[in-house]
């Protein structure tokens, strides 16, 4: 029986240090196991992806006495090849607890695309499915109570041949859908040649149109029955509500920016208007002062002219009187 879980890590170096310290077996994919830390770092730097999560750690555990450490490590490497074929992966096997288990450290960068490994619900689903397929191919048990997928022996036979069953096509179509209701799910499935045949209070039945075969959701696994679907619908609705809220916040932010810019423009227009008024007033005051100065100068000139005329008149009068007195003496 093999179980898996996945977590993200901010430091692959710390994850490797911890895993390597107690490793009984170790192996690697797309890198040298003895230089895994430096290889991981060099790849992230080459693609400029040095922020955020540096990698992910998958814990693959087996029940006691089911596999040897050597077998466990080989199964871990096989899982790595299935779930992260284009990533650098280091596999470390521990045997210091009651069950042997692997620490599978995955570098975040895809060597071909440069994109990061997407650790989400689908990734966990794919890891568990791949792990189940590996266990079946090696005649190992699967924890039925924890299995998200339910395969028949016929499906396992198809999987072992490297083919995809019609039931897996239904699972894949449901996994790809982002529906938030049965109506939306039905529309998505219809585009993939699958029909929701029947929905009751407790069950849902699908039909694969090309194969003309039906199957109940619970036969596919708990994620595909009504309970699992409705959990997914609720999660999708919550995501949509959150996205709508974020859009509203973004719209409000943009409107505020727009209002602030308009306010800045209004203040700029007001400042320009105020400046123009001040400049006009100052110009008027200068012109008024200039007129007053010229008026004073003109008044001063007139005063001096009057004084000059008065002086001339006095001199003329004095001269006339002197001339008259001289004439009388003669």
Curated annotation (Swiss-Prot):
Residues 220-330 are annotated as: Disordered. The keyword Lyase does not apply. Residues 237-269, 279-330 have a biased composition (Basic and acidic residues). It holds the Pfam family Relaxase. Keywords: Plasmid. It comes from the Bacteria. InterPro entries: Endonuclease_MobA/VirD2. This protein is probably required for relaxation complex formation and plasmid mobilization by conjugative plasmids. This is Protein rlx. It comes from Staphylococcus aureus. The lineage of its organism: Bacteria, Bacillati, Bacillota, Bacilli, Bacillales.
């Amino acid at each position: 029986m093999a179980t898996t879980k996945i977590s993200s890590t901010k430091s692959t170096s710390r994850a490797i240090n911890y895993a390597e310290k107690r490793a009984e077996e170790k192996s690697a994919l797309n890198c040298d196991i003895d230089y895994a830390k430096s290889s991981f770092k060099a790849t992230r730097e080459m693609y400029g992806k040095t922020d955020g999560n540096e990698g992910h750690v998958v814990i693959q555990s087996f029940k006691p006495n089911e596999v040897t450490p050597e077998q466990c490590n080989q199964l871990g490497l096989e899982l790595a090849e299935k779930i992260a074929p284009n990533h650098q992966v280091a596999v470390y096997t521990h045997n210091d607890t009651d069950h042997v288990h692997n620490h599978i450290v995955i570098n975040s960068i895809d060597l071909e695309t440069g994109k990061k490994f997407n650790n989400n619900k689908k990734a966990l689903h794919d890891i568990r499915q791949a792990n189940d397929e590996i266990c079946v191919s090696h005649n190992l048990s699967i924890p039925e109570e924890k299995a998200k997928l339910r395969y028949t022996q016929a499906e396992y036979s198809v999987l072992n041949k490297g083919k995809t069953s019609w039931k897996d096509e239904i699972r894949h179509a449901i996994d790809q859908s982002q529906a938030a209701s049965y109506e939306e799910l039905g529309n998505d499935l219809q585009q993939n040649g699958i029909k929701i045949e029947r929905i009751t209070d407790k069950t849902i039945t699908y039909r694969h149109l090309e194969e003309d075969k039906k199957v109940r959701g619970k036969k596919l696994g708990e994620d595909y029955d009504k309970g699992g679907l409705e959990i997914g619908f609720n999660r999708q609705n919550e995501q949509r509500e959150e996205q709508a809220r974020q859009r509203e916040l973004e719209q409000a932010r943009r409107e505020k920016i727009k209002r602030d810019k308009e306010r800045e423009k209004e203040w700029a227009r007001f400042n320009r208007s105020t400046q123009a008024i001040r400049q006009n007033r100052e110009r008027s005051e200068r012109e008024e002062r200039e007129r007053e100065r010229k008026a004073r100068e003109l008044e001063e000139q007139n005063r001096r002219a009057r004084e000059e005329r008065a002086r001339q008149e006095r001199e003329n009068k004095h001269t006339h009187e002197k001339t008259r007195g001289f004439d009388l003496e003669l």
